[in-house]
Amino acid sequence: MVDLNDKVIRGYLRSLVGDDGLKMIEQMPEGNVTDEEIAAKTGVLLNTVRRTLFILYENKFAIVVRERDSNSGWLTYLWHLDFSDIEHQLMREKKRLLRNLKTRLEFEENHVFYVCPQGCVRLLFDEATETEFLCPMCGEDLVYYDNSRFVGVLKKRVEALSSA
């Protein structure tokens, strides 16, 4: 089983399935079990259990086995968790996040922004010229927005992720 005390793994799973889903993962019974059994043993609502299982299945962390009851013909779905690929998933997520941060950093560094003092909008220079430097929402004069602090924060995040 995966180390659920690891901050990174815990944070990643929480972002996928939320707090109730994480509670379900922590208390998940061993072996193949039905969603009803999981709900009964973990105390998590059945709808939440099902939603969590499908999210985990989409991310290749849950395996489902279908069995047909020979008497009734009904299908039973048996679930178990498999986090053997979580390190690979975390690396993919890190690369995706890093790529998005670099794209945003490049955008912020290469554009000039103007904002409404009332907080209505933030516009690119070209958009601001189209509105004659007036807020399209309230008509207030737009002012230059110095995004250097935000650029600095983005650079630190990119650097931290690149070195990790």
Swiss-Prot record:
The keyword Ribonucleoprotein is annotated on this UniProt entry: no
UniProt GO MF annotations: DNA binding
Keywords annotated in UniProt: DNA-binding, Transcription, Transcription regulation
Highest taxon of the lineage: Archaea
GO biological process, alphabetically ordered: regulation of DNA-templated transcription; transcription initiation at RNA polymerase II promoter
SS bond partners: none
Any Pfam family the entry gives: TFIIE_alpha
Record domain HTH TFE/IIEalpha-type: where: 5-87
Transmembrane annotation, as ranges: none
Tagged with keyword Transcription regulation: yes
HAMAP family noted in UniProt: TFE_arch
Domains as described in the record: The winged helix domain is involved in binding to DNA in the preinitiation complex.
Record's function text: Transcription factor that plays a role in the activation of archaeal genes transcribed by RNA polymerase. Facilitates transcription initiation by enhancing TATA-box recognition by TATA-box-binding protein (Tbp), and transcription factor B (Tfb) and RNA polymerase recruitment. Not absolutely required for transcription in vitro, but particularly important in cases where Tbp or Tfb function is not optimal. It dynamically alters the nucleic acid-binding properties of RNA polymerases by stabilizing the initiation complex and destabilizing elongation complexes.
Quaternary data: Monomer. Interaction with RNA polymerase subunits RpoF and RpoE is necessary for Tfe stimulatory transcription activity. Able to interact with Tbp and RNA polymerase in the absence of DNA promoter. Interacts both with the preinitiation and elongation complexes.
Name this protein carries in UniProt: Transcription factor E
Source organism per UniProt: Methanosarcina mazei (strain ATCC BAA-159 / DSM 3647 / Goe1 / Go1 / JCM 11833 / OCM 88)
Gene encoding the protein: tfe
